[in-house]
Each structure stands twice: as C-alpha cells, then as structure tokens.
Amino acid sequence: MKHFQHIEPNRISLNGKRHYIVPEGLAVSEGLVLPSLTTVLSATAPVGKIMALMNWRKRVGVEEANRRTRMAADRGTWMHKIIEDFFNEQDIETALELSPKYRPYFDAICDFLLTIDQCVLAESAIAYGFDPGFGYTGTFDQLAIIGGQYVLIDWKTSYKEKPDYQLADYRQQLGGYAQAIEQMYGIEIDRALCVIAVYDPEDPESKPSRQIIEADGGELVALGALVRQRTVQYFINHYPGSRPFTLTMDRG
C-alpha cells in the first residue's frame, strides 16, 4: 500500500482571506504563502453569484442571514467530526444522542459510508503549484478507496437539494483538490464525489436525503484547468503584489 502522509494545515489570513504557508517536503516551495482553494473560488465568483448572495441577505435580513450562516458552519463542523469518528471506530452513538438536531444529516449519508472500503486520508492539507509560479492550497475532506479505486470525497450539508446552476464551484473544488492530490502523491484520482446531506429542520415534512455530484476522468482534468485559470485571476486582482511571496518558518 502506498504511503500517504497526513499534512496539518498552517493557515494565515491576508486581507481577511484564508491563505496557507506551504510546509516542507512538498513539490511546491516551502514557505510560499498561497490562497486556499475556497478563497480563490469565492474571490473570483461571477458577478451574478455575488449579487444573488447580496440579494438573499437583503431579503432575509442581516441577522437571519448570519444565523443561517453560523448554523451551516456548526453543522458542517459536527458532520466532519462524526464522519472522522466513524472511520476511527469511535463511539458515535453518544455523539448522535447528544446532538439530535444534527442526527438527520448523518442518517442521510449513513448507508453511503458503508460503501467506502477504506479511508486513506482525512482533513489533510494540499498545496498545488503550476507555471509561472502560481498555486493554491487547502484542506480536502477525504481520500478513500471504493471498489479498488481512489475516490476523493467532499462532505457538505444543506437545507435543500441544490439546483445544477449552483454546483459549479462544488465541481471545480473537486477538480482542484483532485489535481493537487495527484501532484503530491503521484496517484490518479479515478472519481471525485461531493456528497451533500440534505435536511431542513424547520420543515416538519422534511426527511433526510442526499445529493451526490460526481466527476471523473476528463471532466476532472477540465475542472482542474478552470481552477488554474481562476487562481491566476486571483493573484492578478487580489493577492498582495500579484506574485507569491515566502515566509520563513521559525523552527526554534
């Protein structure tokens, strides 16, 4: 079995946006300060998407928008922790009993979890570099083996199923993480999945369900190319100085 090193993320903030300092031992130069993949996708989002978000916040009100954003972050953190505990063979029943409002999200993906043969890496940092000296970083959710294939999995939660026009960034996130993992570990990602646990706690008729977005082969390559284009755009329009700089790590 190939060795996969787990890499802890080293996050910093530049102009209020998340970046990482590249650790040693990777193909990308140590100490480079690169934007996270989610930062790249957020900062280079089409105007229409930005306007839609602003209109939503205006429609529901700032207080309600902030409440929903906090709830989404909280349930996402809980979901990632319960999945991690599941694969580490921890006692998850206690956690499920202590968080009944989140349990439906786990129920939505429980049978899918059983199709995963092995969790290879989880919550591990990536760094991807490409000419002419640009790159991005991030933390992917899970690299797994399903049916003898390497499969990248991104876990998400949602109140409702997402329409296709809202999934472009989810797909590009898969492509970005996949090409980074391939560069770092010298493997081929056969499939990439975004698994969304869907449940609306404010709808008494809502039942747990899931939505799966899948990309493989040529589509992943094309998605990765789009991510590279948006990364260059990020450096030109948002990165201090428009070129990657290096921070020297104090090992003392």
Language model feature labels by segment:
Residues 1-5, 10, 234-252:
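Glycine- and charge-rich intrinsically disordered segments
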Residues 1-137:
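Metal-dependent nuclease catalytic cores that hydrolyze phosphodiester bonds in DNA/RNA
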Residues 19, 28, 34, 51, ...:
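Polar low-complexity intrinsically disordered regions enriched in Ser/Thr and small residues
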Residues 124-233, 238:
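Mg2+/Mn2+-dependent nuclease catalytic core
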